[in-house]
């Protein structure tokens, strides 16, 4: 059961014949179309902060990747600067330019993956080859055509799905964070256009707003504790369907059964998160103190007995070992 049901049904884009049989990385495709559609509305952040952080993580272990971010940023800027003028409601660039831009968005998406889940993706990221970081030209060239086809189809749909919004857009920002973002270890939203917070979904499923979607929209809106971004509408755009659904912020919470105003809900969430984080910090402090107490007791027992510490135990207590070396 979903909290909000719009009754809209529109078939999603079909997978093209360029599929080679290998399971596509749908998450990467979703991230790349997100980044591409952000560039439709604002070019203030050519490479999203999450991708920049992923590059920083990659460079720490592979310093030869240092130039990748600068070259990626410069390539996006150059491509957009050279694009021919288009009507205000036009999303898609000429085919060759569009495909080139999509390749760059995929590379940015691969960097984003390193930020989101470094340990899980570092062994399979295309940004490494034989244990070394690939060059920017290699990263761009190796993006599969199947991925480009999938993304290009979604950009074509956006001509009608987002064209009107783009034509009348005034102030747009992407990858925004909120005053409450740090309270949940970071949260950044896709796009804010003239007070409309819009989240992109690249799911194949029907365009029904699921419970998790509702929680996400509500959470982002309420994390703007101080109304810094002046959000007055929230919505979802389904990239594979070309459908957008929006709600006024008060109306959205009324649909969810809220009996308090948005400012009251924000104040309540701020108090709840502060209490939760305080409790979590106390638990961390207690665990750290207990661990330090155990390490001290172990070290004293070892000195008194004069026995060697088993190798297995040393591996289990790296913090204790580092202190021994310091002494």
Predicted stretch roles:
Residues 1-154:
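Residue(s) in the substrate-gating loop at a strand-loop-helix junction
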Residues 10-14, 18-24, 57, 166-192:
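Active-site metal-binding core of divalent-cation-utilizing nuclease and nuclease-like domains
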Residues 146-179:
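Short, conserved active-site entrance elements at the starts or edges of catalytic domains
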Residues 189-206:
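Conserved catalytic cores of phosphodiester-cleaving nucleases, focusing on short active-site segments
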Residues 198, 235-237:
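Hydrophobic/aromatic beta-strand patches that form the interior of the parallel beta-sheet core
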Residues 206-215:
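Active-site-adjacent loop/helix micro-motif of nuclease/hydrolase catalytic cores
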Residues 215-234:
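Metal-dependent nuclease catalytic cores in nucleic-acid-processing enzymes
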Residues 238-327:
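Domain-level recognition of nuclease-like catalytic cores that cleave nucleotide substrates
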């Amino acid at each position: 059961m979903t909290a909000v049901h719009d009754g809209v049904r529109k078939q999603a884009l079909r997978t093209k014949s360029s599929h080679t049989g290998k399971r596509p990385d749908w998450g990467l495709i979703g991230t790349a179309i997100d980044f591409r559609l952000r560039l439709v509305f604002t070019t203030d952040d050519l490479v999203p902060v999450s991708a920049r952080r992923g590059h920083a993580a990659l460079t720490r272990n592979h310093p030869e990747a240092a130039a990748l971010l600068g070259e990626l940023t410069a390539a996006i800027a150059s491509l957009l600067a050279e694009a021919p003028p288009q009507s205000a409601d036009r999303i898609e660039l000429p085919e060759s330019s569009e495909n080139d831009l999509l390749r760059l968005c995929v590379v940015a998406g691969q960097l984003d993956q390193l930020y989101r889940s470094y340990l899980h993706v570092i062994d399979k990221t295309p940004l490494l080859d034989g244990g070394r970081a690939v060059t920017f030209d290699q990263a761009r060239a190796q993006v599969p055509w199947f991925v480009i086809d999938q993304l290009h189809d979604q950009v074509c749909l956006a001509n009608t799905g987002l064209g009107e919004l783009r034509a009348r857009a005034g102030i747009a920002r992407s990858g925004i964070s909120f005053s409450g973002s740090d309270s949940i270890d970071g949260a950044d939203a896709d796009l804010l256009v003239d007070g409309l917070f819009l989240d992109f979904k690249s799911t194949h499923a029907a365009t029904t707003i699921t419970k998790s979607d509702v929680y996400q929209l509500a959470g982002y809106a309420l994390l703007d504790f101080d109304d810094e971004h002046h959000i007055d509408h929230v919505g979802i755009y389904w990239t594979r369907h070309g459908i957008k659904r929006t709600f006024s912020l008060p109306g959205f919470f009324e649909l969810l059964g809220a009996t308090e105003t948005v400012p009251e809900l924000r104040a309540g969430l701020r108090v709840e998160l502060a209490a939760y984080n305080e409790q979590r910090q106390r638990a961390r402090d207690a665990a750290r103190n207990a661990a330090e107490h155990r390490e001290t007791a172990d070290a004293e027992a070892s000195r008194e007995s004069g026995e060697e510490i088993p190798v297995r135990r040393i591996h289990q207590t790296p913090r204790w070992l580092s202190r021994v070396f310091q002494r």
